Regions:
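Single-stranded nucleic acid-binding surfaces, predominantly the OB-fold ssDNA-binding core
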Residues: 1-126
Length: 126
């Protein structure tokens, strides 16, 4: 399995979906739906936030981030390539093993923002 990691910064609106999961190991992940508008079109993403040794980000997002808020997310794009059972042993037209690629966004920070019409720019909310 290959993993490709990049850095991204997205500004958008928090959607309705939010799910918090706790693991037997004591870890936690919070997943939110996040909408980014490009022109007249909205693109939706699912962003995962995890608790770490230095910051309980999943707990913070689960408790404090609300539907409809504008936030800026900093995170990483993580691409997982894997071969599901139904494709095991199969190859494409070039003889390469068939795989599926799945891209996820893992957030490592967020900040609330608002649009200042007077200055015509986004600003952070404390």
């Amino acid at each position: 399995m290959a993993i490709l990691t990049n850095s991204v910064s997205l500004l958008g609106k928090v959607g309705k979906y939010k799910e918090c999961k706790c693991f037997e190991t004591g870890g936690m992940v919070t997943t939110i739906n996040f909408g980014v508008k490009t022109g007249e079109k909205w693109n939706n993403f699912f962003i995962d936030f995890f608790n770490t040794k230095t910051r309980e980000l999943a707990t913070e997002v689960g408790d404090n981030v609300k539907e409809g808020e504008w936030i800026q997310i900093k995170g990483r794009l993580i691409e997982n390539k894997f071969t599901p059972k139904h494709l095991e042993g199969k190859t494409d037209e070039n003889g390469n093993p068939m795989t599926i690629s799945q891209t996820k966004i893992v957030g490592f920070d967020y900040k609330r923002v608002r649009y200042n019409e007077e200055l015509e720019e986004w600003e952070y909310i404390q």
